[in-house]
Amino acid sequence: MSKRVVITGAGVVHSLGTELDEFWENIKAGKSGISKIENFDASDFPSQIGAELKDFDPGEYIDRKEAKRLALYSQYAIVAAMKALENADLEIND
């Protein structure tokens, strides 16, 4: 059985950009989002490189108090989902 899927919006939270246009331009330009890890001391790990988000600020999408309680990867997921809703011009009402 096949099911149809409709993609109505996209949101991105990536080391190459947190806005779709910026992300896409960096992809097209062949830029790498990989660099030396700076968010923590990685000297005890076999590799000290990774794809970190620089200057990530979830404040536009998540209350600061709530963000402090959430793991960073959860913040990334929430922000990406909210950006996808915006991109799709979808509004969620209670």
Label each PLM-derived region with a short phrase.
Residues M1-D94:
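Conserved "HGTGT" condensation-loop signature of ketosynthase/thiolase-family condensing enzymes
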